Amino acid sequence: MAKSLLASSLSVRTKILQTGVSLYNTTHGFHEEEVKKILEQFPGGSIDLQKKQNGIGILTLNNSNKMNAFSGAMMLQLLERVIELENWTEGKGLIVHGAKNTFCSGSDLNAVKALSTPENGVALSMFMQNTLTRFMRLPLISVALVQGWAMGGGAELTTACDFRLMTEESVIRFVHKEMGIVPSWGGASRLVEIIGSRQALKVLSGTFKLDSKEALRIGLADEVLQPSDEATALEQAQEWLEQFVSGPAQVIRGLKKSVCSGRELYLEEALQNERDVLETLWGGPANLEAIAKKGKHTK
């Protein structure tokens, strides 16, 4: 009986990791269509996606009049873009950045003020947790390019990316305590995964302004880019990402899937996932070409 329950639990966890599967449904008290109707009432800004032929996507937060704060419409569009990326089989990498040299200042306060009941807060939390968890599980190697400020929900969004690049003048700040709340888009859990529980508690309770040097020191940032304008920084980010996404898309996507399963699944299930991914690659075009080109004993 116990083995049966464990196998069932593992199966559920594995299914959750599958691309395109929502984190919540009505059994969790989550009514997605109702939340969407509420968010539609708060227009403004856009989430723009460019899918390049080299397999790198560019996701732009565009609401520059409000430091790229998330309006309700932008939250809806972010989910739409995630679904689009889930179906982009040629994709290998993704860069997330904000328009006009600012990453994101969090949620638009107009929406926050209107959604002031605990019920609305929890519904919004579940919507964004679902979106950003699906984002995190995309079979794409993702990079947050932080220019200017990444605050509140913007700081949480950076943690959903695999890597974070910062320009010298940029700042990441989790301001939730000063707003009388806690991170609710999954940011606290992901921050613990990235920098450890002790550092995460300091960052969240201290509401520190993490400049690029401090973020690099504690392991939140992966590299600091030289001073540059928006276009040049984006070019630098693409060059940085290219070192990790060179090669066949199927292989890069398989690597990301393997890392996701290793992070989120029990060991036995993660090992099974490794074998499942390997089965799609072993003896495939990339594998056979590499063997023929390099030979078994060459370096």
From Swiss-Prot:
The modification N6-succinyllysine is found at residues 209, 293. The modification N6-acetyllysine is found at residue 209. Its main location: cytoplasm. Its EC number is 4.1.1.94. Decarboxylates ethylmalonyl-CoA, a potentially toxic metabolite, to form butyryl-CoA, suggesting it might be involved in metabolite proofreading. Acts preferentially on (S)-ethylmalonyl-CoA but also has some activity on the (R)-isomer. Also has methylmalonyl-CoA decarboxylase activity at lower level. This is Ethylmalonyl-CoA decarboxylase. SUPFAM superfamilies: ClpP/crotonase. It comes from the Eukaryota. One of its GO terms (biological process) is fatty acid beta-oxidation. The lineage of its organism: Eukaryota, Metazoa, Chordata, Craniata, Vertebrata. Pfam families: ECH_1. PROSITE patterns: ENOYL_COA_HYDRATASE. It catalyses: (2S)-ethylmalonyl-CoA + H(+) = butanoyl-CoA + CO2; (S)-methylmalonyl-CoA + H(+) = propanoyl-CoA + CO2; (2R)-ethylmalonyl-CoA + H(+) = butanoyl-CoA + CO2. GO terms for molecular function: carboxy-lyase activity; methyl/ethyl malonyl-CoA decarboxylase activity. GO terms for cellular component: cytosol.
